[in-house]
Amino acid sequence: VNWSDSERAIITDIFSHMDYDDIGPKALSRCLIVYPWTQRHFSGFGNLYNAEAILGNANVAAHGIKVLHGLDRGVKNMDKIVDAYAELSMLHSEKLHVDPDNFKLLSDCITIVVAAKMGSAFTPEIQCAFQKFLAVVVSALGKQYH
């Protein structure tokens, strides 16, 4: 993947200001609510019976934060994203059996929550760079499935 200086700067800036404790739980909760079939991977998280339960679930919140911090790996390794996520790709495909399409669904939810948080500062240029970054990470996470 070729990254322009502008794209690198945008990605670095977004993550340097990221409120992980807010965005992570909101993004994962949104994914579990909007795409309820994704809940099957979180059966050990307790009550996920409705939106209110998901939004108040401490396990969902903690995992959302963990997932969002997982993107730091990509930010720090933008030129070697596939290598950076090789181990996680293997874990999700061979042990957890996560449908790789779920990574795209979660990335869309992350984009929505980041856009809501940034408001008018989430310009088309910023969205383009952010979604490109997430698409590369999603592809890397799905690499083991190919």
From Swiss-Prot:
One of its GO terms (cellular component) is haptoglobin-hemoglobin complex. Residues 2-146 form the Globin domain. GO terms for molecular function: haptoglobin binding; heme binding; metal ion binding; organic acid binding; oxygen binding; oxygen carrier activity; peroxidase activity. Keywords: Heme, Iron, Metal-binding, Oxygen transport, Transport. Heme b binds at H63, H92. InterPro entries: Globin (IPR000971), Globin-like_sf (IPR009050), Globin/Proto (IPR012292), Hemoglobin_b (IPR002337), Hemoglobin_oxygen_transport (IPR050056). Pfam families: Globin. One of its GO terms (biological process) is hydrogen peroxide catabolic process. Involved in oxygen transport from gills to the various peripheral tissues. PANTHER family: HEMOGLOBIN FAMILY MEMBER, HEMOGLOBIN SUBUNIT EPSILON. This fish has two hemoglobins: Hb1 and Hb2. Hb1 is a tetramer of two alpha-2 chains and two beta chains, while Hb2 is a tetramer of two alpha-2 chains and two beta chains. This is Hemoglobin subunit beta. The lineage of its organism: Eukaryota, Metazoa, Chordata, Craniata, Vertebrata.
